[in-house]
Swiss-Prot record, chain A:
Protein name: Glucosamine-6-phosphate deaminase
Cellular component terms per the entry's GO annotation: cytoplasm
Catalytic activity, as annotated: alpha-D-glucosamine 6-phosphate + H2O = beta-D-fructose 6-phosphate + NH4(+)
GO function terms (MF aspect): glucosamine-6-phosphate deaminase activity; identical protein binding
Lineage, top ranks: Eukaryota, Metazoa, Ecdysozoa, Nematoda, Chromadorea
Active-site residues from the entry: 71, 140, 142, 147
Family, per entry: Belongs to the glucosamine/galactosamine-6-phosphate isomerase family.
Organism field: Caenorhabditis elegans
Swiss-Prot record, chain B:
Keyword Ribonucleoprotein attributed: no
Binding residue positions for substrate: 165-166, 247-248, 255, 281-284, 340-342
Keywords per UniProt: Carbohydrate metabolism, Hydrolase, Metal-binding
One GO term (biological process): N-acetylglucosamine catabolic process
Sequence positions that bind a divalent metal cation: 154, 223, 244
Source superkingdom: Eukaryota
Name of the protein in question: N-acetylglucosamine-6-phosphate deacetylase
Protein species of origin: Caenorhabditis elegans
Major enzyme class: hydrolase
Family annotation (CDD domains): NagA (cd00854)
Length: 267, 418
């Protein structure tokens, strides 16, 4: 795996966006679609902004891009400001030239959750699998909504959210905990593991312990992102704050590789 | 299939039918203000872009680059006496001539970004009303011209003292003993009437207001000598508007404010809101008076031009009903007097002047010529906003409110030549 340590969140976003651009251009040159797995949340926001800038500058087109989002709340109207459909539409999709027929977000308003999840896995397979899964992590090391205790072999499914997550989310729902969704549909850990490449974005000191557990401790379902240790091509991009819990030798080791990593996104 | 990318001057925009069109790179006026957004249109209606994206999962057939211009709902003028040499109060000899004049004005208004208007008729004889009113059937905007919202009948039930340019001999100063009978005798059918301006102090006025409201007509108080009391009674009876505030009414007095006092009346409630037309041409309303109105009751401010036949014409002598008007620059005076007639200012001019005189934001000025008049007339579920489902009647303007292009039902119906 790679750990790329950038100075701040803005640099993390820049690196991540450049990496996505590089992958899109490679796929386009090979006459192929690039299939992306996409997250929501404050951490990837910066990456989306950079990608929009690259699009507006004519550096990139999303014409040959397909997307699969990681998760979506259950029983939250699609057009609710906090739904992930809204997040992706407002912060990314409406600003670029992606064909809406090529985007996929789990439908949390379906009456048959199991079928919706099975269909989602089938569509990923039909698209040839995900080329690059971009993700963020929670302070407890969860990836998508695979919270502590989720099976590392899990697939796309409905998940009941834990109390901490619900309380943390209340601030997005007018501080009213009764309005916070209690369930979500989420891709599984194995679904992410099946991707050809995974890129995890981590910023802020509140994620430092999670990063430590993810890369310096053993693989554990109590920290689902630690499964990435077994991924054949995983990249973590962190800012300085997120490395505060890492051993000095770990940080020095990966910083020593930065020139090589930097060359991955030169254009 | 990828979208065809066009600019606003493309000839295709005048002929778009049922294609899915996305207007992008524009500042869209919505209730939250001016925001960089897109507008999606098909079959002449504004679509919900998320529904298009997530349900139809389709890309636009056509994308139109608006080059950073402001995209505002088309302007609405509730008081327009004519323009371009045509006077709505003049009926000469036949219906065809009148209809052609109306159509000419409607067509020319598109260049001013006006997509809806109320043809305004000043005090006239019953014979004239009976001939004109059937010809003023409401219509939607199209490439043929701005849409007709229905007639605005200013008079004849007005104060003789405050008639302004209205012909004295035709003014009717009482609606007693039978207001409904008198109205039907004078106007004929109320079917094509959108607004009636009347003086609330006349005998029988309150009953007349209730009658007009029951027929779906908006009542505006004006050309009046009324004190505040009758004005408040009018509002409680259902009147919703003051006609050209400050003009043709009693001046403000601290022991009886007259109709101007309605702006702060305790009788105003959500059930009885009040709008007022105001002419911000720099002539009819002093800038200081504009500021007084704006700071006293900004929610009720509605821009009207009260423009006459000379709108869009050069200086000279023009007709307004049976009256002769002399025009010089932006001033229009009744022949032989110093009485101000209607204005010769366009709606974009009035919007600009309101901003300059009051310092109000452009969003407020534009809303005062779009959403507010639409709400007042009860047509905001079709016009005056860019909300989903509405008619795609809009105008592209720059920050100086210069009209660059006008669209009706999604088709470009006017393009400014640079």
């Amino acid at each position: 795996m790679k750990l790329i340590i950038e100075e701040n969140a803005d640099k993390v976003a820049e690196f991540a966006a450049r990496y996505v651009v590089t992958k899109i251009n490679e796929a386009t040159e090979n006459g192929k679609y690039l299939v992306l797995g996409l997250p929501t949340g404050s951490t990837p926001l910066g990456m989306y902004k950079k990608l929009i800038e690259f699009y507006n500058a004519g550096v990139i087109s999303f014409e040959k891009v397909k997307t699969f989002n990681m998760d979506e709340y259950v029983d939250l109207p699609r057009d609710h400001t906090e739904s992930y459909h809204s997040f992706m539409f407002d912060n990314f999709f409406r600003h670029i030239d992606i064909n809406p027929a090529n985007i996929h977000i789990l439908d949390g308003n379906t009456s048959d959750h199991e079928k919706e999840c099975e269909e989602y896995e089938r569509k990923i397979k039909e698209s040839g699998g995900i080329d690059l899964f971009v993700g963020g992590i929670g302070p407890d090391g969860h990836i998508a909504f695979n919270e502590p205790g989720s099976s590392l072999a899990s697939r796309t499914r409905i998940k009941t959210l834990n109390e901490d997550t619900i309380q943390a989310n209340a601030r997005f729902f007018g501080g009213d905990i009764t309005k916070v969704p209690t369930q979500a549909l989420t891709v599984g850990v194995q679904t992410v593991m099946d991707a050809r490449e995974v890129m995890i974005l981590i910023t802020g000191s509140h994620k430092a312990l999670a990063l430590h557990q993810a890369i310096e401790c053993g693989i554990s379902h109590m920290c689902t992102v630690s499964a990435m240790q077994m991924h054949r091509c995983a990249t973590f991009i962190a800012d300085e704050d997120a490395t505060l819990e890492l051993k000095v030798k770990t940080v020095k080791y990966f910083k020593g590789l930065m020139n090589h990593h930097r060359s991955l996104v030169m254009f | 299939m990828l979208p065809r990318k066009l600019k606003i001057d493309s000839t295709e925009l005048a002929e778009i039918t049922n294609e899915l069109v996305q207007f992008l790179n524009c500042l869209v006026l919505r209730s939250g203000g001016l925001k960089k957004e897109h507008i999606w249109v098909r079959n002449g209606r504004i679509l919900d872009e998320r529904t298009v994206f997530f349900e139809e999962k389709t890309m636009a057939d056509v994308q139109i680059d608006c080059e950073g211009l402001i995209l505002s709902p088309g302007f609405i003028d509730l008081q327009l006496n004519g323009g371009f040499g045509i006077d709505f109060s003049t009926y000469n000899s036949d219906d065809k001539e009148y209809q052609e004049g109306l159509a000419l004005v409607a067509k020319q208004l598109l260049a001013h970004g006006v997509t809806s208007f109320s043809p305004t008729v000043i005090t006239s004889s019953p014979e004239t009303y009976h001939k004109i009113l059937p010809l003023l059937k409401p219509s939607n905007a199209s490439s043929e011209g701005a849409g007709n919202l229905g007639a605005h009948l200013e008079g004849p039930f007005i104060s003789a003292d405050k008639r302004g340019c209205h012909p004295e001999q035709l003014v009717i100063t009482s609606l007693s003993p039978n207001p409904v009978e008198i109205i039907e005798h004078v106007y004929g059918s109320t079917e094509n009437i959108a607004i009636v301006t009347m003086a609330p102090e006349l005998e029988g006025a309150q009953e007349a207001i209730e009658y007009f409201v029951s027929t779906g007509t908006t009542v505006s108080v004006g050309h009046s000598s009324a004190k505040l009391g009758p004005g408040e009674m009018a509002v409680l009876s259902g009147a919703k508007m003051i006609t050209h505030l400050f003009n043709a009414m009693q001046s403000y007095h601290h022991r009886d404010p007259g109709l101007i006092g309605l702006l702060t009346s305790s009788k105003l409630t959500p059930d009885h809101p009040l709008y007022y037309g105001i002419i911000s041409d720099g002539i009819h309303t002093h800038d200081s008076a504009l500021r007084i109105a704006y700071h006293t009751n900004s929610a009720g401010l509605v821009l009207v031009t009260d423009a006459i036949a000379a709108l869009g014409m050069s200086d000279g002598v023009h007709k307004l009903g049976t009256q002769t008007i002399h025009v010089k620059g932006l001033e229009a005076k009744l022949d032989g007097t110093n009485t101000t007639a209607g204005s010769v200012a366009s709606m974009p001019y009035c919007i600009r002047h309101l901003m300059k005189a009051t310092g109000c934001p452009i969003e407020f000025a534009l809303q005062s010529a779009t959403h507010k008049p639409a709400t007042l007339l009860g047509v905001s579920d079709e016009k005056g906003t860019l909300d989903v489902g509405r008619l795609a009647d809009f105008v592209l303007i720059d920050k100086n409110v210069t009209v660059k292009a006008t669209f009706c039902s999604g088709k470009r119906v006017f393009l400014a030549q640079d």
